[in-house]
């Protein structure tokens, strides 16, 4: 179980209250698929992922990026029990989709990069620390079924 300070809770809540899901989600997933091309194998049904331009312009990638980012809402709303909040998604990704659990960390890094670019100077070291702690808890929860 993750221990959260009041300040960390406030930072996470503030990030999500200002989150531009329609911008950050597609950019983060696109970045992950471009920077780590082996992650594309899980998205073969998404159509043309031939190059960066195709990935960035792919409506299926954009829609899934938004869905993934909204999936983080579950963790934000259940910060005291993140592991249990993601049990069903962990099972889906491990047993049905067979996603390499390392991919969750890669995507979380891409989300952090895109969020930092969007927030600019407001993305302080303290903000980054709280956000990465949150994402690490989500990544761990999503990988729970693999252990």
Swiss-Prot record:
Keywords: Heme, Iron, Metal-binding, Oxygen transport, Transport. Red blood cells. Transmembrane segments: none annotated. GO terms for cellular component: blood microparticle; haptoglobin-hemoglobin complex; hemoglobin complex. One of its GO terms (molecular function) is organic acid binding. GO terms for biological process: hydrogen peroxide catabolic process. Heme b binds at residues 64, 93. The keyword Iron applies. PROSITE patterns: GLOBIN (PS01033). The keyword Metal-binding applies. Gene3D superfamilies: Globins. InterPro entries: Globin (IPR000971), Globin-like_sf (IPR009050), Globin/Proto (IPR012292), Hemoglobin_b (IPR002337), Hemoglobin_oxygen_transport (IPR050056). Residues 3-147 form the Globin domain. Pfam families: Globin. Heterotetramer of two alpha chains and two beta chains. Involved in oxygen transport from gills to the various peripheral tissues. Belongs to the globin family. This is Hemoglobin subunit beta.
